[in-house]
Amino acid sequence: MDKIELEKIVREKIKEMLGDSGDEFMVEASGRHIHLSEEHMKHLFGEDYKLTPVKDLSQPGQYACKERVRVIGSKGEFSGVVILGPCRNETQIELSLTDCTTIGVKGVIRESGKIEGTPGILIGVGDKFVKIDKGVIVAQRHVHMTPEDAGRLGVKDGEIVKVRVNGRRPLIFDDVLIRVKDSYKLSMHIDYDEANACGFESGTTGSIYRK
């Protein structure tokens, strides 16, 4: 049994124990990754190329791909950056604040999809490159949920809340965005900087903090 399979079993077991009526939800840590537009994907990989899904993500319809890219800033670069599918209307790269400092890109905290006024970067695959003038974000920490979840937890789409995360170093995160959609699966997303701060490990849970 590999690590991915083990983490999936742990997540499912915790969800089973919490049930649909609990106030706690799963917390997931996301590493650096990229969402490519169809145009940029074809430029980097070829006109008729199709990305290769290798792992389903927790949010329905989203997946990690086999293909990787380089992202190149003024002070350095990251190779092996995972592509998440399917393609989006605009290319977006999600880095942590530490990542941004490392490669010389300004770290702008934004909700996913809101990329106006964000920095650009150079993206490479082999001898093919694409330079984007916007799209690099530090993703605002957020909780995905359905309308039913939102009603049960007493929150609404777009609301900013505090969340207590029960990691090995429990802490309360402020400025957490609530994202509500019928297709969403209840879970909180943080990046690796935030994961390290709370002592994240597989099975970490969180809850809305109201005190």
From Swiss-Prot:
Enzyme class: transferase
Residues that coordinate or bind Zn(2+) 1: 33, 35, 94
Main location: other
Cofactor binding summary note: There are 2 Zn(2+) ions per monomer; Zn(2+) and CoA bind inbetween the 2 domains in each monomer.
Binding positions for CoA per the UniProt entry: 29-31, 75, 196
Family: Belongs to the PduL family.
Protein name in the entry: Phosphate propanoyltransferase
Organism: Sebaldella termitidis (strain ATCC 33386 / NCTC 11300)
UniProt gene name: pduL
